[in-house]
């Protein structure tokens, strides 16, 4: 559809949720205007290089923020264990339309690959613009204009004002400032359970040997994966985001914190495998828990990430490897 003159809707964030929201808006006959705090895929790579080479984190452009969000450099695994997912075929078909392999439509555990995702993400953006939508980079939401509990508009970069009746917040996991903004505007938010843990790395040959009962380099078998679930002291411990033939990467959004993520290229041909090993954490189990503090989980998360930064010598290196 051509929507350049259609009613407008603001979408905050150009990650997976924001890009899909923009495409759905176009289907519904609305003009999406996407505001992304980070940079486009090409410009974003320079900031990623600074993290890897100089250990310098740009808080607005990093492995989490920028075109495609964390998804652009996060493997492209499309499998979820959630039972609330509904019919995901439409989303998979869109990804194929924009450049992903058709195999993802039939694979049990579909996977695109970090090396292929940037082109897919860029193609999605180009399609949004071609249909009459807009995508703005280096455009951070800094305020919401609310009158009598009714949204009237938004502020970008503490400078530009835009009138909108409807805004989609597709800001993702790491945009903590959005939660504080909502709280300050009187929007009810509350702490929720989350998962916390470490990322374990193994030689891929070892995982192959275990999972394939002695096979390590059979050319007819893909690099092996695993799934781990256990109860420890009444708490669920489980593997998450298992990456065969992958790498571990730094995903902090602030200089003084350490966060890790993992992903694989499309061929999953790196010599190491990795997986998050996490525990389910309830807000009531946290040391400073009070029922009226909506930020108790966020504050605990920040404390852990800063403690890892200190333990790692105040660099972006992990404390132990």
What does each of the following model-derived ranges do?
Residues 1-94, 98-321:
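Residues forming the flavin
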């Amino acid at each position: 559809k051509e929507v350049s003159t259609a009613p407008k809707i603001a979408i905050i964030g150009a990650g997976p949720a924001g890009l899909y929201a923009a495409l759905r808006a176009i289907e519904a006959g609305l003009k999406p205007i996407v505001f992304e705090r980070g940079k486009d895929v090409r410009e974003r790579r320079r900031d990623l290089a600074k993290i890897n080479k100089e250990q310098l984190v740009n808080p607005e452009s990093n492995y989490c923020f920028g075109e495609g969000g964390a998804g652009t450099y996060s493997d492209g695994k499309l499998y979820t264990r959630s039972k609330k997912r509904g019919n995901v075929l439409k989303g998979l078909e869109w990804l194929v339309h924009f450049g992903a392999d058709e195999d993802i439509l039939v694979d049990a555990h579909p996977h695109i690959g970090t090396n292929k995702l940037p082109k897919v993400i860029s193609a999605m953006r180009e399609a949004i613009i071609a249909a009459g939508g807009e995508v703005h980079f280096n455009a951070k939401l800094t305020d919401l204009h609310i009158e009598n509990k009714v949204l009237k508009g938004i502020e970008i970069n503490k400078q530009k004002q835009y009138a909108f009746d409807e805004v989609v917040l597709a800001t993702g996991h790491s945009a903590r400032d959005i939660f504080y903004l909502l709280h300050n505007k009187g929007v009810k938010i509350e702490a929720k359970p989350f998962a916390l843990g470490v990322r374990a790395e193994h030689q891929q040959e070892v995982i192959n040997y275990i999972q394939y009962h002695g096979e390590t380099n059979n050319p007819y078998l893909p690099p092996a994966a695993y799934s781990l679930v256990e109860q420890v002291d009444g708490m669920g411990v489980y593997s998450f985001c298992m990456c065969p033939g992958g790498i571990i990467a730094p995903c902090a959004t602030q200089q003084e914190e350490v966060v890790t993520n993992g992903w694989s290229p499309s061929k999953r041909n790196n010599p190491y495998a990795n997986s998050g090993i996490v525990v389910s954490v309830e807000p009531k189990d946290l040391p400073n828990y009070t029922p009226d503090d909506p930020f108790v989980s966020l504050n605990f998360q920040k404390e852990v990430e800063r403690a890892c930064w200190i333990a790692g010598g105040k660099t972006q290196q992990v404390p132990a490897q």
